[in-house]
């Protein structure tokens, strides 16, 4: 099974959307194997968004993600990265399809409720930035045989 990183951003936490995001992930059949609420330190935020360091919006992005608590998760499932990205929707909520998290709840590209890894490499990097190995729980859902034809 593939793992990916998902984070409910400060706007999602402040608007009470944490449960909605978790519910959508779980109803899709994905499994949460790690989760915590934290207030991201500036250094961690800069590492998380390192690929945007030279872009003009970098400082504002770091300011925003450190402005309030977030909920960080490791989510597991078959094709988890692609499945989660589809559930989340386009980065710009105005372009996100109805029925996606951003399409239903996002109002602004800078306040788009949730972050999700976009590749296996970014998932691995982001998971290791936010979680130690002993914080990730390996467990089997009772309904996995009903969700996946093959595992």
UniProtKB/Swiss-Prot annotation:
Q: Which residues form the signal peptide?
A: none
Q: Name one GO cellular component term.
A: cytoplasm
The protein's required cofactors: Mg(2+)
Could you list this entry's UniProt keywords, alphabetically sorted.
ATP-binding, Cytoplasm, Kinase, Magnesium, Metal-binding, Nucleotide metabolism, Nucleotide-binding, Phosphoprotein, Transferase
What does the record give as the reaction this protein catalyses? a 2'-deoxyribonucleoside 5'-diphosphate + ATP = a 2'-deoxyribonucleoside 5'-triphosphate + ADP; a ribonucleoside 5'-diphosphate + ATP = a ribonucleoside 5'-triphosphate + ADP
Q: What does this protein do?
A: Major role in the synthesis of nucleoside triphosphates other than ATP. The ATP gamma phosphate is transferred to the NDP beta phosphate via a ping-pong mechanism, using a phosphorylated active-site intermediate.
How is this protein named in the record?
Answer: Nucleoside diphosphate kinase
Q: Which organism is it from?
A: Archaeoglobus fulgidus (strain ATCC 49558 / DSM 4304 / JCM 9628 / NBRC 100126 / VC-16)
